[in-house]
């Protein structure tokens, strides 16, 4: 549903990203030979970027896109979701045409008939073969199949048919290799902010030869300044404007994190900028305090202290005990781990502020 005719006092902005858009377009313009991992810190704009580039690509060439946003979908499932839950989100029962698969797949799922559905759940039909047939059919029609999975790590603990011998994620990777490197049938794009999950893939010798990694980072300063000094153009904000010093203050507080900038702009409808930023910094400090106060407090403080005067912590500077603590910080989105650099970073400027303020107490 389009919302272009609805008036809002602030809209979500999309700023530049031309380099990233060009990279993704070039990926889809070449014959599929590798599957692509989009990685980067939380809220760096990976999902928004994918939606944007897909809209542009669909206007220029024939594509058939399946976009599985697992972060969104699995909120509907219980914590102990299993293989059958995955099948339910992957396949939809569509029109039946003489017992064969229909080809109208435009909503992010693969449509199948009831007979195929029954055989899949009985284990008599390999679901990956069903998807492969659909890719072949599209390929023969001159249509490019594009499969995008956002936050793939949500499937990391699922086993096939509830057994403990075949992990679903491994079978998916084998399928991705077959569809790209071996058969050149489809484009596979995986987006994730879980650096540890991606590190497993990045250091797997087999998968490393079949995949590409591309980092989507926060916006650079010049793009943030362009946005904040032209709020009506990019965010449709008419209620207030920002001066260059105002924009500098926002940059120094949250950097290029678009989600956090949007949040600050929303708060400014009711409060002056300095008050908004002061409250924001206090909030970030309180998040660090809430995380640190636990039995391992002294050990956590020792690790976080690394970031008071520096931006990164290389993996070679830590030991196995440190790694366990840092792993939890990554999962709680306090720290970001970059698998391509083997280094830890605060989860953006705002968390960096929170860490520094914590040690100023």
Each model region followed by its residue ranges:
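A short, basic N-terminal segment
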Residues: 1-41, 55-61, 70-73, 196, ...
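Conserved Walker B catalytic segment
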Residues: 120-206, 211, 324
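Short, conserved phosphate/pyrophosphate- and ester-handling motifs at nucleotide-, phospho-/glycolipid
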Residues: 17, 47, 257, 348
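Structured catalytic cores of enzymes that bind and process phosphorylated ligands/cofactors
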Residues: 38, 47-50, 64-67, 165-169, ...
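Conserved small helical "lid"/interfacial subdomain of P-loop NTPases
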Residues: 211-246, 250-255, 259, 264
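Winged-helix-like regulatory helical subdomains adjacent to P-loop NTPase cores
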Residues: 250, 258-332
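Conserved nucleotide-binding/hydrolysis micro-motifs of P-loop NTPases
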Residues: 72-75, 154, 194-198, 220-224, ...
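P-loop NTPase nucleotide-binding core
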Residues: 30-162, 330
């Amino acid at each position: 549903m389009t919302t272009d005719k609805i008036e809002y006092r602030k809209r979500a902005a999309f700023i530049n990203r031309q380099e990233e858009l060009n990279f993704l377009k070039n990926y889809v313009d070449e014959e599929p030979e590798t599957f692509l991992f989009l990685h980067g810190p939380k809220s760096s704009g990976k999902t928004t970027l994918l939606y944007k580039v897909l809209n542009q690509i669909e206007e220029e060439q024939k594509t058939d896109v399946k976009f599985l946003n697992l972060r969104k979908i699995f909120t509907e499932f219980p914590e102990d979701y299993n293989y059958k839950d995955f099948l339910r989100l992957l396949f939809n029962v569509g029109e039946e045409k003489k017992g064969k698969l229909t080809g109208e797949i435009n909503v992010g799922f693969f449509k199948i008939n009831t007979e195929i559905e029954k055989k899949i759940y009985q284990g008599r039909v390999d679901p990956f073969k069903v998807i492969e047939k659909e890719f072949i059919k599209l390929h023969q029609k001159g249509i490019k199949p594009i499969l995008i999975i956002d936050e793939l790590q949500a499937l990391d603990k699922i086993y096939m048919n509830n057994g403990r011998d075949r992990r679903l994620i491994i079978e998916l990777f084998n399928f991705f290799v077959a569809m790209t490197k071996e058969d050149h049938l489809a484009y596979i794009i995986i987006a994730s902010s879980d650096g540890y999950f991606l590190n497993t893939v990045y250091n797997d010798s087999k998968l490393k030869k079949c995949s590409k990694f591309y980092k989507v980072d926060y916006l650079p300063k010049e793009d943030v300044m362009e946005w904040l000094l032209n709020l009506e153009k990019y965010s449709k904000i008419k209620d207030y404007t920002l001066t260059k010093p105002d924009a500098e203050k926002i940059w120094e507080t949250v950097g290029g994190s678009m989600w956090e900038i949007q949040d600050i702009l929303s708060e400014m409808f009711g409060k002056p900028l300095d008050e908004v930023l002061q409250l924001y910094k206090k909030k970030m400090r309180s998040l660090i305090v809430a995380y640190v106060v636990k039995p391992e407090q002294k050990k956590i403080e020792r690790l976080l202290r690394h970031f008071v005067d520096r931006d990164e912590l290389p993996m070679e500077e830590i030991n196995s005990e440190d790694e366990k603590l840092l792993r939890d910080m990554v999962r709680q989105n306090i720290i970001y781990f970059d698998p391509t650099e083997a280094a830890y970073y605060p989860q953006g400027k705002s968390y960096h502020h929170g860490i520094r303020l914590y040690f100023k107490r």
